[in-house]
Amino acid sequence: MPIMNIEDKLDLEEINKSFVNKESKERIIWAYETFKEGLFLTTSGGKTSAVLPNLTRDSLGFSPPIIFVDLGYFNDCTHNMLKYLENEGYDIRIYKSLISKKEIEEKYPNWSDPDSDYFNKVVSIIKHEPLNRGFKELKVKAWLGGVMSHETEERKTANFVQYNKSICQVLPILDWDHCKINEYLILNKLPLNQNHFDITKGPDQKRECNIWKECGIFRNT
């Protein structure tokens, strides 16, 4: 008799329906109870990146390790957010491209223009490959992401729980609005990274850079 994977056992439609009426902490607890040590967090070091680790620690009494992909192009504000998380005792696992920034810029000049023929190629090199490598090395079964549906058009169609490439993504604060996220930041005295800039998201910072296809984000099932 074949062994069933967790993915085969989960009724995603029912889980997502039930999550509509659950608190964010309950969603996090469900994720840990389901995936145990296979659960990780991800962070971009972005504007509200202090929220999910804090909420997770408050929900579970601890936080699973946090995966950060260093694109090689982040500013000091984003690196300071990572330092803050490290100073707060979070276990940060950093992954980066195996190709140096210098090599990339020599081989793919002006790649950061979204209209460049090189744009998607370099995004894959500096973001998708390191993240997938991290997932494989750490044996990630599921990961918590801190995205919210109001942030981009594509995120409006995301589910609380979804699968891609045998990895489950759980978005516990998907339904938070501006007021709720700001209230949480203030009540918990958390830092805000107003100057975060992700070069892979383009000048308007709205691109999802196909990461849902490559690393399991925002794929509806």
Residues covered by each model-derived region:
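Nucleotide-activated chemistry modules centered on ATP-dependent adenylation/adenylyltransferase
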Residues: 2-221
